[in-house]
Amino acid sequence: MTNIRKMHPLMKIMNSSFIDLPAPSNISSWWNFGSLLGACLAIQIITGLFLAMHYTADTATAFSSVTHICRDVNQGWIIRYIHANGASMFFMCLFIHVGRGMYYGSFTLSETWNIGIILLFTVMATAFMGYVLPWGQMSFWGATVITNLLSAIPYIGTSLVEWIWGGFSVDKATLTRFFAFHFILPFIITALVMVHLLFLHETGSNNPLGTTSDSDKIPFHPYYTIKDLLGLLFLLLLLMMLVLFSPDLLGDPDNYTPANPLITPPHIKPEWYFLFAYAILRSIPNKLGGVLALIMSILILAILPLLQTTKQRSMVFRPFSQIMFWTLTADLFTLTWIGGQPVEYAFVIIGQIASILYFSLILIIMPTVSLIENNMLKW
């Protein structure tokens, strides 16, 4: 009798995706982050659902409903902090996942890569709207500043901003629709994740060498299920240490002050995971130029396959490309730091240099270095 997991229509899909899936025998721990992102998404949806049971999307009661969750709801404080810090874990895994794709040349799997970019934008939109919901000072002013960027679009900008706001300023209508979108988007993300996996399983995973793995595959279970489980334990350990020891480490103290349209905080800034893009936005004096640079800082990932000049897919045997990759990583850390600093002369200059370096590395320096390495292979 054939095993039920190979015969049952539903079990068959699960089996071919997570049990009998042929996987490369040499994929390293950098390949763990896909499953960790799935775990983060599950954690966020579950904790978010419980928070939504007690939250009220109304300007008069939103702030106090979050306070009520933390003070009066059974284990409400831990659910709230797991959700807030879970977002940070989500983005940490996302950035490593994208970095892994760049380093090992996974962007050559174009459908998977492009769905991944759409996922990145969707997750960023979801996180932004979630940050607005507690209706603290930084929530309100962050929403005002970021949505106002759309007014830079010629002709329709102002109308578009007022349409998104549902009025002439960020108010009750804005909060209500942001809550509605914040609730529905994670389910859209889940659907996109399924499409992402569908395309990945069409071609099979890349591996650290960047070579084809067809001749050497192993079953996903038990080898990679155990490996993913270990990664998940590390993730949960890190998340719970953050939640239980310093839950406000990555947050902003201004968000513990209820939103007040009459008082502007001294320094408006988004959460840490948006700071690199925020620094690029601020480094360009022109509003429209800044918005375009902001969008391009993420959208530039889509043209990576066109910029590939190397004969080797992975960077494992390309030391100069490795140096450029880690320079790019350091540059992103610099941009993140600058995004959190006030707009003062020294910080502005550093931000502008880091922004120019970011685009130069991806568009010019890395493809050029790859060409040089190609020529060195002939020696």
UniProtKB/Swiss-Prot annotation:
<keyword id="KW-0479">Metal-binding</keyword>
<comment type="function">
    <text>Component of the ubiquinol-cytochrome c reductase complex (complex III or cytochrome b-c1 complex) that is part of the mitochondrial respiratory chain. The b-c1 complex mediates electron transfer from ubiquinol to cytochrome c. Contributes to the generation of a proton gradient across the mitochondrial membrane that is then used for ATP synthesis.</text>
</comment>
<dbReference type="GO" id="GO:0008121">
    <property type="term" value="F:ubiquinol-cytochrome-c reductase activity"/>
</dbReference>
<dbReference type="InterPro" id="IPR048259">
    <property type="entry name" value="Cytochrome_b_N_euk/bac"/>
</dbReference>
<keyword id="KW-1133">Transmembrane helix</keyword>
<dbReference type="Pfam" id="PF00033">
    <property type="entry name" value="Cytochrome_B"/>
</dbReference>
<feature type="binding site" description="axial binding residue">
    <location>
        <position position="97"/>
    </location>
    <ligand>
        <name>heme b b566</name>
    </ligand>
</feature>
<keyword id="KW-0496">Mitochondrion</keyword>
<keyword id="KW-0472">Membrane</keyword>
<dbReference type="GO" id="GO:0046872">
    <property type="term" value="F:metal ion binding"/>
</dbReference>
<keyword id="KW-0999">Mitochondrion inner membrane</keyword>
<keyword id="KW-0679">Respiratory chain</keyword>
<feature type="transmembrane region" description="Helical">
    <location>
        <begin position="178"/>
        <end position="198"/>
    </location>
</feature>
<feature type="transmembrane region" description="Helical">
    <location>
        <begin position="288"/>
        <end position="308"/>
    </location>
</feature>
<protein>
    <recommendedName>
        <fullName>Cytochrome b</fullName>
    </recommendedName>
</protein>
<keyword id="KW-0830">Ubiquinone</keyword>
<feature type="transmembrane region" description="Helical">
    <location>
        <begin position="347"/>
        <end position="367"/>
    </location>
</feature>
<feature type="transmembrane region" description="Helical">
    <location>
        <begin position="77"/>
        <end position="98"/>
    </location>
</feature>
<dbReference type="GO" id="GO:0006122">
    <property type="term" value="P:mitochondrial electron transport, ubiquinol to cytochrome c"/>
</dbReference>
<dbReference type="InterPro" id="IPR005797">
    <property type="entry name" value="Cyt_b/b6_N"/>
</dbReference>
<feature type="binding site">
    <location>
        <position position="201"/>
    </location>
    <ligand>
        <name>a ubiquinone</name>
    </ligand>
</feature>
<comment type="similarity">
    <text>Belongs to the cytochrome b family.</text>
</comment>
<feature type="binding site" description="axial binding residue">
    <location>
        <position position="196"/>
    </location>
    <ligand>
        <name>heme b b566</name>
    </ligand>
</feature>
<feature type="binding site" description="axial binding residue">
    <location>
        <position position="83"/>
    </location>
    <ligand>
        <name>heme b b562</name>
    </ligand>
</feature>
<dbReference type="Pfam" id="PF00032">
    <property type="entry name" value="Cytochrom_B_C"/>
</dbReference>
<dbReference type="InterPro" id="IPR030689">
    <property type="entry name" value="Cytochrome_b"/>
</dbReference>
<feature type="transmembrane region" description="Helical">
    <location>
        <begin position="226"/>
        <end position="246"/>
    </location>
</feature>
<dbReference type="InterPro" id="IPR036150">
    <property type="entry name" value="Cyt_b/b6_C_sf"/>
</dbReference>
<comment type="subunit">
    <text>The cytochrome bc1 complex contains 11 subunits: 3 respiratory subunits (MT-CYB, CYC1 and UQCRFS1), 2 core proteins (UQCRC1 and UQCRC2) and 6 low-molecular weight proteins (UQCRH/QCR6, UQCRB/QCR7, UQCRQ/QCR8, UQCR10/QCR9, UQCR11/QCR10 and a cleavage product of UQCRFS1). This cytochrome bc1 complex then forms a dimer.</text>
</comment>
<feature type="transmembrane region" description="Helical">
    <location>
        <begin position="113"/>
        <end position="133"/>
    </location>
</feature>
<dbReference type="GO" id="GO:0005743">
    <property type="term" value="C:mitochondrial inner membrane"/>
</dbReference>
<keyword id="KW-0813">Transport</keyword>
<dbReference type="InterPro" id="IPR005798">
    <property type="entry name" value="Cyt_b/b6_C"/>
</dbReference>
<feature type="transmembrane region" description="Helical">
    <location>
        <begin position="320"/>
        <end position="340"/>
    </location>
</feature>
<dbReference type="GO" id="GO:0045275">
    <property type="term" value="C:respiratory chain complex III"/>
</dbReference>
<keyword id="KW-0349">Heme</keyword>
<keyword id="KW-0812">Transmembrane</keyword>
<dbReference type="InterPro" id="IPR027387">
    <property type="entry name" value="Cytb/b6-like_sf"/>
</dbReference>
<feature type="transmembrane region" description="Helical">
    <location>
        <begin position="33"/>
        <end position="53"/>
    </location>
</feature>
<dbReference type="InterPro" id="IPR016174">
    <property type="entry name" value="Di-haem_cyt_TM"/>
</dbReference>
<keyword id="KW-0408">Iron</keyword>
<feature type="binding site" description="axial binding residue">
    <location>
        <position position="182"/>
    </location>
    <ligand>
        <name>heme b b562</name>
    </ligand>
</feature>
